[in-house]
């Protein structure tokens, strides 16, 4: 297979598993990410590279020159690179706007310059804000509550706009819901709880613990990414990617972590009732959100 795929943010959690699947399937893959990200995960990336064709390219999506070099010869771009984290992005709104909007524009422009055939944009379930109904399907109105969500809505519109002006650039938009799996950093709640349980510490839940989610495993989610890449029926469409079953409150999920990871330890879920010390912002918290993947 000679299809060349560029994955921006390829050294990230979803990026690494996406790259693994594509390399194993015979694609010629280029992982484009910040130098510190690639270096942090170089052992995993080297192991993936031993399975097939993988090129590592250091660069920022704010650097047009490095983007243009990376895009040379590309057939498909999967654009995962973004500034993440509610508190981080709310504390640095201008930085978030620059990376997630200007950066996406740069990636799209480089893709057009090199005649890329398909652009897959990684959006987020955050674009739905606090939904009117659950489960959420793709036709529901977008109404993001955070600057991160607004930048993802803008990225979706940029992607559609480029397709209008350059019809040869097909696109698909993916709205990722909560994802978990091996290799996820501990700033994310499930990974943090697992680490706490292994260390004999109680999982801590901020707020009342009744926030409701459904988590998809990264293996399933990235299988969806590959199917979107490979099927032209996805062109011009938007898809939710996540788990539409196993809906849990955060209290229930934390208890399940204890039972699965450390049943022999005398642990209990600590529900704090507020957000003091959390990386979440109370007025930005989404209470119930899970996806309809039908």
Question: Which stretches of residues belong to each language-model region?
Answer:
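Catalytic helix-loop patch of NAD(P)-dependent Rossmann-fold dehydrogenases
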Residues: 91-94, 98-106, 113, 117-118, ...
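Conserved NAD(P)H cofactor-binding loop of Rossmann-fold oxidoreductase domains
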Residues: 81-84, 123
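C-terminal substrate-binding subdomain of Rossmann-fold SDR/epimerase-dehydratase oxidoreductases
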Residues: 197-294
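Residue-level signal for the nucleotide or nucleotide-sugar donor/cofactor binding architecture
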Residues: 62, 91, 99-102, 139, ...
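Conserved sequence/active-site signature of Rossmann-fold short-chain dehydrogenase/reductase
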Residues: 62, 127-128, 179-181, 221, ...
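N-terminal Rossmann/SDR dinucleotide-binding element
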Residues: 1-76
């Amino acid at each position: 297979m000679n299809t060349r795929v560029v994955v921006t943010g390829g050294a990230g959690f979803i990026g690494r598993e996406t790259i693994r699947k594509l390399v194993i399937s015979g694609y010629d893959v280029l992982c484009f990410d910040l130098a510190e990200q690639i270096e942090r995960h170089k052992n995993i990336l080297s192991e993936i590279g031993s399975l097939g064709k993988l090129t590592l390219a250091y660069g920022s999506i704010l650097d047009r020159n490095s983007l243009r070099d990376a895009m040379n010869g590309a057939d498909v771009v999967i654009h995962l690179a973004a500034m993440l984290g509610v508190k981080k992005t709310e504390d640095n709104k201008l930085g978030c706007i620059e990376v997630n909007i200007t950066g996406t524009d740069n990636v799209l422009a480089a893709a057009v310059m090199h005649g890329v055939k398909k652009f897959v944009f990684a959006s987020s379930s955050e674009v739905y804000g606090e939904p009117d109904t659950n489960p959420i399907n793709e036709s529901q109105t977008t109404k993001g509550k955070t600057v991160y969500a607004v930048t993802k809505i803008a990225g979706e519109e940029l992607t559609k706009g480029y397709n209008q002006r350059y019809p040869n650039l097909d696109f698909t938009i993916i709205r990722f819901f909560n994802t978990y799996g091996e290799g996820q950093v501990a700033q994310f709640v499930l990974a943090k709880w697992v680490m706490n349980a292994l260390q004999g510490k109680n999982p801590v839940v901020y707020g009342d613990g009744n926030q409701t989610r459904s988590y998809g495993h990264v293996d399933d989610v990235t299988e969806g990414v590959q199917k979107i890449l490979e099927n032209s029926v996805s062109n011009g469409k938007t898809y939710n990617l996540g788990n539409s079953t196993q809906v849990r409150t955060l209290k229930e999920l934390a208890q399940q972590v204890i039972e699965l990871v450390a049943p022999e330890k005398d642990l209990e879920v600590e529900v704090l009732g507020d957000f003091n010390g959390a990386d979440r912002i109370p007025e930005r918290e989404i209470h119930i959100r899970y996806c309809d993947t039908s």
